[in-house]
Curated annotation (Swiss-Prot):
The gene is rpl4. One of its GO terms (cellular component) is cytosolic large ribosomal subunit. One of its GO terms (molecular function) is rRNA binding. It comes from Thermococcus kodakarensis (strain ATCC BAA-918 / JCM 12380 / KOD1). This is Large ribosomal subunit protein uL4. One of the primary rRNA binding proteins, this protein initially binds near the 5'-end of the 23S rRNA. It is important during the early stages of 50S assembly. It makes multiple contacts with different domains of the 23S rRNA in the assembled 50S subunit and ribosome.
Length: 255
């Protein structure tokens, strides 16, 4: 499949042939598994001190006192200790470090999931179904010249996004930023932020600095491209801006 390459003014300058990876069959099941596997590998194992709740001098007072025969503090027989239902006692079933809390995925399945997610970015119906505003986008998949990599001013990237037709989607992401319900507000994740366009480049020459302040916009190099960037929340079809160099690098990696 041939697509046009646009300059920073939104004008077509040439045509290129897309790599075969953009013809990969759509596999939402593998994409979902790969994203969840990536999530779970960020979880830190939990455990408890094996001696927690057991560092008390206790005794069993035996029967004949009109009290339950549980371990009690030696100096204060009135207070139970050590047992799970006592104040300061041990946990009944504490979390174990040995618990398997991550999900694995085979290497070939992960590779196929990334390839399928890349192909989904070129599917107009999937991009629109994901919620992106694509009415004014000049082309899907959107390929631009490598000059985009050198833009390091936020004002410049704003004008480029407007000329390429993706600014409406950034406005959507800005409007959909909401305060999170629950205690997550206190734990460093106060806002729920929508995902906007993804910019994939061959090499960062300033574009990260130029695009990072736009709501919902992510920038990543092809070599660091993962399924979480392409399908946030396990939902494939993210609106993606590819540079020409990134397309050529994809051809080298995936064919």
């Amino acid at each position: 499949m041939k697509v046009k390459v646009f300059n920073l003014e939104g004008e077509p300058v040439e045509e290129i042939e897309l790599p075969k990876v953009f013809s990969t069959p759509f596999r939402p099941d593998l994409i979902r598994r790969a994203v969840i596997a990536s999530w779970t590998h960020r979880i830190q194992p939990q455990g408890r001190d094996p001696q927690a709740g057991k560092r008390r001098v206790t005794e069993n007072i035996g029967k004949g006192h009109g009290m339950a025969r549980v371990e009690r503090i030696k100096t204060s027989p009135r207070f139970a200790a050590f047992v799970p239902f006592a104040v300061g006692g041990r946990r009944t079933h504490p979390p174990k470090v040995e618990k398997i809390i991550w999900e694995d995925i085979n290497k070939k399945e992960r590779r196929l999931a990334i390839m399928s997610a890349i192909a989904a970015t070129a599917n107009y119906d999937l991009v629109r179904a994901r919620g992106h505003v694509v009415d004014n986008v000049v082309q899907i998949p959107l390929v631009v010249t490598d000059d985009l990599q050198k833009v390091f001013k936020t004002a410049q990237t704003r004008e480029i996004f407007k000329k390429l037709g993706v600014w409406d989607d950034i406005e959507r992401a800005k409007k959909n930023t909401k305060i999170r319900a629950g205690k997550g507000k206190m734990r460093g994740r106060r806002y729920k932020k929508a995902k906007g366009p993804l910019i994939v480049v061959a090499k960062n020459e300033g574009i990260v600095q130029g695009a990072r302040n736009h709501p919902g916009v992510d920038v990543v190099t092809v070599d660091n491209l993962g399924v979480e960037y392409l399908a946030p929340g396990t939902h494939p079809g993210r609106l993606t801006i590819w540079t020409k160099g990134a397309i050529e690098r994809l051809r080298e990696i995936y064919g």
